[in-house]
């Protein structure tokens, strides 16, 4: 019995040794992983029949699997079926289906992209709604009348006539009968040029801006950076002046596009500083001081003050004394002053427009390096589609940095050459500015009178393409919500798109920006009729 016990123990030990050896044994290749289990099947309890059939069946399916999945030999060179065989290979089809199959969700959009995607305002919502159903007296008389877009159609005929007469000549510029001259001309158009604008256009723009200011101030071409519109000009300048998390103080109401133009990619905050109707929406230095101190307490670094002159949306000029006060405030706080003057040449009021450049020139011992101007040709020359903007800065470091960033926002050379010719045509420019101002003045008064017919009063404007209309007596609830409901009714029932004051950060409900330069005189009666459907149905709330 003792031997038997020892023998059993020996067998168990031998079995454990064999098992351990099996674990230490290197893995077999692919064929052995199939054959070894088959051996167990043949020797199993199923008998000879099962032990024979099952291995044969498994072996058959294994061979079929290999045959179907191995690559076929390539066709001989020159074979007409070589390309087609590769195109219809089962493996290629299998991979294509696998790549195209919607097995998982798409990669996530960035947080920055998501914030842009989700950001919106009634200003842009109205523009989109109008673009989808624009009014036309013949082709779409029931469409939406556009009063939300600051675009000038009043003088397009003047620009169009000049283009017809001079565009071909301007495009060739240095071209002539000589072959070398023609080659030089095409090189000047097709080759790379400075991203911040060619010198000829900088000189022409400096002269045009001086003409806009009626010769009261001169501009240096070396301080000009040209961009593809005033929007990128504003963004590039902001990028150079402030860091993410910094802020600009902005007297409000202000142009609603700045919330996108400045904040989206730079990460700079805009702090509205309310101006009130009781003060004629004038900028208050006291209010700026309070806003600056509040931002400082919250740990926000204020890097500048941003204004528009003429003001957008009120259409008023910033008084010369206020510009002096703003410069003193900027110097005291050691911050920048940015003046958006894109409507400087689109004036029609009795007052005189004064650029911050004129005020700076009058000051002695003042550091001009904190003063910057935004300009463009979209408004004063009705060339919005040409996409030409200007950064004018007295700060050499800002000019250098902005010129480098302008590579992402450069204007095409043919466009620049064409504009050099146009701006150099002094007779055309003088005639255009004179006629355009007359047409603006006439349409402004027609528009204000039309609104007055339906009981809507307008703040007195001196420049720009719009009037600042007070519709507060037509909102049922004196609140932003009540303003929103009136805006909805104007858009959906009257088919008129306007910009609500809340989009401009106006703290007084019921103000709306109404642009009049996309209208013709024949559109005015239609507008009056549509507005009556809203104003006549409202019982004034005060």
Curated annotation (Swiss-Prot):
Residues covered by region (Disordered): 1-28
Where is it made, tissue-wise?
Expressed in leaves.
**Effects seen without this gene:** Enlarged starch grains in endosperm, spherical starch grains in pollen, decreased number of chloroplasts in leaves, enlarged chloroplasts with increased number of starch granules in leaves, reduced number of total panicles and slight reduction of seed weight.
Where is it chiefly localized? plastid
Sorted UniProt keywords: Amyloplast, Ethylene biosynthesis, Lyase, Membrane, Plastid, Pyridoxal phosphate, S-adenosyl-L-methionine
Cofactor(s) required, per the database record: pyridoxal 5'-phosphate
> According to the UniProt record, what class of enzyme is this?
lyase
Question: What's the EC number here?
Answer: 4.4.1.14
Q: In which pathway does it act?
A: Alkene biosynthesis; ethylene biosynthesis via S-adenosyl-L-methionine; ethylene from S-adenosyl-L-methionine: step 1/2
Q: Where in the cell is it found?
A: Plastid, Amyloplast membrane
The record's annotation in InterPro entries points to: Aminotransferase_I/II_large, Ethylene_sulfur-biosynth, NHTrfase_class1_PyrdxlP-BS, PyrdxlP-dep_Trfase, PyrdxlP-dep_Trfase_major, PyrdxlP-dep_Trfase_small
Give the modified residues of type N6-(pyridoxal phosphate)lysine: 379
User: GO cellular-component terms in the record?
Assistant: amyloplast membrane
Gene Ontology biological process terms from the UniProt entry? amino acid metabolic process; ethylene biosynthetic process
Q: What does this protein do?
A: Catalyzes the formation of 1-aminocyclopropane-1-carboxylate, a direct precursor of ethylene in higher plants. Required for the regulation of starch grain size in endosperm.
Q: What protein is this chain from?
A: 1-aminocyclopropane-1-carboxylate synthase 6
Taxonomic lineage of the native organism: Eukaryota, Viridiplantae, Streptophyta, Embryophyta, Tracheophyta
Which gene is transcribed and translated to give this protein? ACS6
């Amino acid at each position: 019995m003792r031997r038997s016990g020892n023998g059993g123990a020996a067998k168990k030990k031998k079995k454990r040794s064999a098992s351990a050896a099996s674990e230490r044994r290197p893995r077999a290749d692919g064929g052995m992983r199939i054959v070894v289990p088959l051996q167990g099947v043949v020797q199993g309890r199923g008998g000879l029949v099962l032990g024979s059939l099952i291995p044969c069946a498994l072996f058959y399916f294994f061979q079929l699997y290999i045959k179907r999945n191995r690559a076929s030999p390539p066709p001989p060179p020159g074979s007409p079926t070589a390309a087609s065989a590769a195109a219809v290979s089962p493996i290629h089809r299998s991979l294509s289906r696998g790549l195209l199959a919607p097995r998982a969700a798409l990669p996530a959009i960035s947080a920055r992209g998501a914030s842009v995607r989700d950001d919106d305002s009634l200003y842009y919502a109205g523009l989109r709604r109008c673009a989808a159903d624009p009014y036309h007296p013949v082709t779409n008389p029931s469409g939406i009348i556009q009063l939300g877009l600051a675009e000038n159609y009043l003088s397009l005929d003047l620009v169009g006539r000049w283009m017809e007469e001079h565009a071909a000549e301007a495009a060739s510029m240095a071209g002539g009968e000589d072959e070398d001259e023609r080659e030089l001309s095409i090189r000047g158009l097709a080759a790379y040029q400075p991203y911040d604008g060619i010198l000829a256009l900088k000189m022409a723009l400096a002269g045009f801006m001086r003409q806009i200011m009626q010769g009261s101030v001169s501009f240096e071409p070396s301080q000009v950076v040209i961009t593809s519109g005033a929007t990128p000009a504003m963004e590039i300048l902001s990028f150079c002046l402030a860091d993410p998390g910094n802020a600009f103080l902005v007297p409000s109401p202000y142009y609603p596009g700045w919330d996108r133009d400045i904040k989206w990619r730079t990460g700079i905050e805009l702090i509205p500083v309310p101006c009130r109707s009781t003060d004629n929406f004038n900028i208050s230095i006291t209010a700026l001081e309070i806003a600056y101190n509040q931002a400082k307490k919250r740990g926000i670094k204020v890097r500048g003050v941003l204004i528009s002159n003429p003001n957008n949306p009120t259409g008023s000029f910033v008084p010369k004394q206020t510009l002096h006060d703003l410069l003193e405030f900027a110097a005291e706080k050691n911050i920048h002053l940015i003046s958006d003057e894109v409507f400087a040449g689109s004036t029609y009021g009795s007052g005189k427009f004064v650029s911050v450049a004129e005020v700076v020139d009058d000051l002695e011992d003042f550091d001009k390096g904190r003063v910057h101007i935004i300009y463009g040709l979209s408004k004063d020359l009705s060339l919005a589609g040409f996409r030409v903007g200007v950064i004018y800065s007295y700060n050499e470091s800002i000019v250098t940095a902005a010129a480098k960033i302008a590579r992402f926002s450069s204007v095409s050379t043919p466009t620049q050459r064409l504009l050099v010719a146009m701006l150099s045509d002094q007779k055309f420019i003088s005639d255009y500015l004179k006629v355009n101002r007359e047409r603006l003045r006439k349409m402004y008064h027609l528009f204000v009178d039309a609104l007055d017919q339906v009981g809507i009063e307008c703040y007195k404007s001196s420049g720009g393409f719009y009037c600042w209309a007070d519709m507060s007596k037509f909102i049922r609830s004196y609140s932003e919500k009540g303003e929103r409901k009136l805006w909805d009714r104007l858009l959906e029932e009257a088919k008129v798109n306007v910009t609500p004051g809340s989009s401009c950060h106006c703290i007084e409900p019921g103000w709306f920006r109404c642009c009049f330069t996309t209208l013709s005189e024949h559109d005015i009666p239609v507008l009056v009729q549509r507005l009556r459907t809203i104003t006549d149905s409202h019982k004034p709330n005060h």
